[in-house]
């Protein structure tokens, strides 16, 4: 039993030895059959101690950082002891974001960056280019989060529509916004077809590309072609396709000089405001808008202490002041509408500096190229037109300069100024004194030198007065024609200083004054009144003293009726002599006295001063009877 156990143990030991040799053999075979070539350790710049750093020459490096692919070229590349990496000499870095396809190109003499490209410093002729954006500066600082580019050492910036320079630059890639500060100079290209660019100078400039809006502040000056000006701040907006400037807003002490592309000839009667080539505008705020399909100004709006001035080569001048203004232009640059409101005032001066006309009111409106000029009153102020020879106040005043016509409507008040040096007078009123007029409507036609009034007209000078519903005044001749309840009131000079001043009133449906004949005529249902007597007739002929409004005689014709206290006279004609204080009735005159009965004669003379009546008959033997009422 013991021998069998020993034999089995030996067999088992032998098997183990065989198995061991087999394992060793297989292992040796596997080792020799799967042997790898000797590995070359990769260079890791960050792991190399400073004393062992080596510069790589003429490198081209690719780096994959998340969604970014970075390609770097340079004459030299090395890592510093500060854990930063350096590229030097003709450095160019191209970066593409996956999915966007936008390539960003960075160039410079030297670039410093960290391993994740979170912060990059570009030095020496540094530039960054992406799409149409190009930035150049001596030094540029790039930050990845948030992704920005900045410098404080002066920069140049350009894109399809904007280019310029400044001391400081800050650009946000995510917001596509640009900020420039310090001695900013900007060029905004105003449309693909426009040869001119909007040039800006300011302390600060900001532009947001998504909003197509920009802002300039701090001593802003601007120019566009021959147009130029200044303001505290300027805002602009491009059209959605960024092809042209859509709107410009200027704020704070704005001054602008606007020059039309072509000069429009100005002839006699033209409105300088409408056809002036150059306009100087001042206001607290000015907004300029362009046509949507062409780079030309369509409108200008101004607010706050507005002032506009235009001058002609001849020396004539126009100035406008108001709280608000608006101008609309046509596609050729001509003015098609002008509006000024809130305390609006327009002043025109002739080439010798004298006043041509002054207009003021709540609103001044120019339509067309000066075809119509209107002034409207406000709730507390009337419309005013003041010129060398007249002053007109109304609710609304309209001028048609090319036709030389003026119209005034509603609550019209006019003053015809004294014109002693001119031959013509206003009707029978003295030329040495002003004539005052009230009416519902007034019209003046310069070519005919004719005035027309309508509606409850009242014209007066001192105590002499003329009233009617319609009235025409020919200024060249001084002739006056009136219609509709015409009434004239004349003051009579007292013969003695102690006597009271008296007056005589005349009226009719129609009136005509002829200065050459010194004759004032009333027709249709005419009448006359004095302190003591009244008269009615078909017509009245008033003889006036030459060059004055003094009445000499009044002749009545047709169905004359005279009433003097208790007496009534009737005749075909009557002659009233104011200096003699007599009224002579002819043409079958008859006087009816309530106390003395009926008097007849060929001629009856009322002596208004002493209540006597002289009766005359033209028979073979002339007879005269004097009748006096008892006191």
Question: Language-model features: where?
Answer:
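Mature-chain termini and adjacent capping regions
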Residues: 1-631
């Amino acid at each position: 039993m013991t021998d069998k156990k020993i034999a089995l143990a030996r067999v088992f030991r032998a098997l183990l030895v065989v198995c061991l040799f087999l394992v060793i053999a297989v292992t040796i075979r596997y080792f020799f059959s799967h042997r790898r070539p000797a590995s070359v350790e990769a260079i890791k710049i960050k792991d190399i101690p400073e004393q062992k750093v080596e510069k790589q020459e003429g490198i081209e490096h690719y780096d994959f950082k998340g969604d970014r692919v970075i390609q770097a070229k340079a004459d030299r590349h090395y890592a510093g002891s500060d854990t930063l990496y350096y590229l030097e000499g003709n450095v160019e870095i191209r970066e593409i974001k996956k999915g966007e396809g936008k390539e960003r190109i960075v160039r410079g003499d030297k670039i410093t960056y960290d391993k994740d490209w979170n912060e990059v410093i570009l030095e020496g002729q540094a530039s960054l280019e992406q799409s149409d954006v190009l930035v150049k500066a001596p030094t540029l600082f790039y930050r990845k989060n948030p992704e920005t580019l900045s410098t404080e050492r002066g920069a140049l910036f350009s894109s399809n529509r904007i280019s310029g320079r400044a001391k400081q630059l800050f650009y946000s890639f995510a917001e596509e916004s640009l900020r420039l500060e310090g001695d900013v100079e900007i060029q905004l290209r105003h449309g693909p077809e426009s040869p001119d660019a909007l040039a800006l100078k300011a302390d600060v400039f900001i532009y947001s590309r998504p909003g197509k809006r920009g802002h300039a502040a701090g001593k802003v000056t601007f120019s566009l072609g021959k147009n130029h000006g200044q303001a505290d701040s300027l805002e602009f907006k491009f059209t959605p396709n960024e092809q042209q400037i859509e709107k410009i807003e200027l704020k704070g002490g704005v001054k602008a000089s606007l020059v039309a592309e072509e000069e429009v000839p100005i002839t006699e009667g033209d409105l300088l405001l409408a056809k002036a080539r150059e306009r100087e505008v001042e206001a607290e705020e000015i907004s300029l808008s362009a046509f949507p399909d062409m780079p030309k100004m369509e409108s200008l709006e101004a607010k706050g202490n507005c002032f506009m001035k235009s001058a002609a080569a001849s020396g004539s001048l126009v100035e406008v002041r108001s709280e608000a203004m608006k101008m609309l232009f046509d596609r050729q640059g001509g003015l098609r509408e002008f509006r000024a409101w809130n305390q609006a005032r327009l002043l025109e001066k002739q080439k010798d500096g004298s006043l041509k006309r002054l207009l003021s009111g709540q609103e001044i409106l120019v339509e067309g190229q000066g075809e119509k000029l209107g002034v409207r009153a406000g709730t507390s102020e009337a419309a005013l037109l003041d010129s060398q020879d007249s002053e007109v106040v109304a609710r609304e005043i309209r001028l048609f300069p090319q036709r030389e016509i003026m119209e005034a409507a509603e609550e019209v008040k006019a003053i015809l100024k004294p014109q002693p040096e001119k031959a013509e007078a206003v009707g029978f009123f003295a030329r040495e004194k002003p004539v005052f007029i009230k009416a519902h409507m007034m019209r003046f036609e310069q070519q005919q030198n004719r005035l027309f009034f309508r509606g409850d007209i009242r014209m007066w000078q001192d105590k002499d007065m003329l009233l009617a519903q319609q009235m025409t005044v020919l200024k060249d001749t001084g002739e006056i024609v009136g219609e509709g309840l015409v009434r004239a009131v004349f003051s009579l000079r007292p013969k003695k200083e102690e006597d009271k001043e008296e007056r005589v009133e005349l009226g009719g449906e129609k009136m005509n004054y002829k200065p050459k004949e010194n004759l004032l005529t009333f027709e249709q249902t005419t009448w006359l009144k004095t302190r003591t007597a009244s008269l009615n007739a078909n017509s009245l002929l008033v003889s006036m003293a030459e060059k004055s409004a003094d009445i000499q005689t009044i002749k009545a014709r047709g169905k004359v009726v005279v009433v003097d206290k208790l007496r009534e006279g009737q005749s075909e004609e009557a002659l009233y002599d104011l200096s003699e204080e007599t009224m002579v009735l002819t043409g079958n005159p008859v006087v009816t006295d309530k106390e003395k009965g009926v008097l007849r004669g060929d001629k009856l003379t009322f002596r208004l001063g002493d209540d006597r009546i002289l009766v005359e008959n033209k028979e073979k033997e002339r007879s005269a009877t004097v009748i006096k009422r008892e006191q």
